[in-house]
A protein has these predicted regions:
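Short, charged cytosolic
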Residues: 1-12
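Acidic, low-complexity intrinsically disordered regions
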Residues: 6, 15, 29, 33, ...
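Intrinsic disorder/low-complexity segments enriched in polar/charged and small flexible residues
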Residues: 12, 35, 91, 113, ...
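Short, glycine/small-residue-enriched coil/turn segments at secondary-structure junctions
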Residues: 84-88
Length: 224
């Protein structure tokens, strides 16, 4: 079966393995940066005089920053799993994309334009609102000088989700049968952050409920 033939992306075994590998790498990097911090402090305390402290402060600070950053990856990674459990993969070709500000939004971030699943003629900008792990994607979005083979690495675009709320994008792994570089995208109105009201995008009740199960914050159903 093709990846797009499964009822949800999570039913596709290579996708499950890709997500597990994604989580393992986060854990490995977290342990690694903690080990760097502990090891550096141990060397400073056990083998060096206090005069070397200023030399180690930047390293300890950077190791702390990187360890905290790995912790910050866990929550969006669990949301990735929730999205994959709700939506099937789609293979999208020639998806409109840009590195500069989209004319329909306020934020100056990279974006894809994805069709509204209930109104395919409507293109919805889906932004890279979280700046974590975006450099790989930014290089492949490219510019007029970017090599075509680099841009081709995100053709087709693996897409699972609803662009009105929350989605996962990925690139093709080796052989094209498994995803790699799983990345969470979402609308700011779907985050549930204080002061940001959710919006329903005129979505059907079924679409709203599906998005809610995928981890998006959506309005409560209107009373009948």
């Amino acid at each position: 079966m093709r990846p797009t033939d499964y009822s949800t992306a999570w039913d596709h075994p290579p996708t499950r393995r890709a997500w597990i590998q994604h989580m393992i790498m986060i854990a490995v990097r977290l342990v690694g940066w903690i080990a760097v911090w502990v090891g550096s402090l141990g060397v400073l305390v056990s083998f060096l005089s206090p005069g070397f402290t200023p030399l180690f402060v930047p390293l300890l600070g950077y190791a702390t920053y990187r360890a905290v950053l790995q912790l910050a990856y866990f929550r969006p990674s669990t949301t990735i799993q929730r999205v994959l459990r709700q939506y099937p993969w789609q293979f999208l070709m020639d998806v409109p994309r840009g590195r500069n500000k989209h004319p329909q939004v306020q934020e100056d971030e990279m974006w894809f334009e994805i069709p509204n699943p209930e109104k395919p003629e409507e293109q919805i900008p889906l932004l890279f609102l979280a700046n974590m792990r975006t450099f790989w994607w930014m290089r492949r979005f490219g510019t007029s000088r970017t090599k075509p083979e680099l841009k081709a690495q995100i053709e087709p675009l693996w897409f699972a989700g609803d662009p009105r709320f929350v989605a996962v994008v990925a690139a093709s792994g080796r052989g094209g049968e498994a995803p790699k570089r799983l990345h969470l995208l979402y609308q700011r109105t779907a985050t549930g952050r204080r002061g940001i009201a959710p919006t329903d995008w005129n979505a059907s009740p079924a679409a709203l409920e599906r998005a809610r199960r995928a981890g998006a914050h959506v309005p409560d159903p209107s009373p009948q």
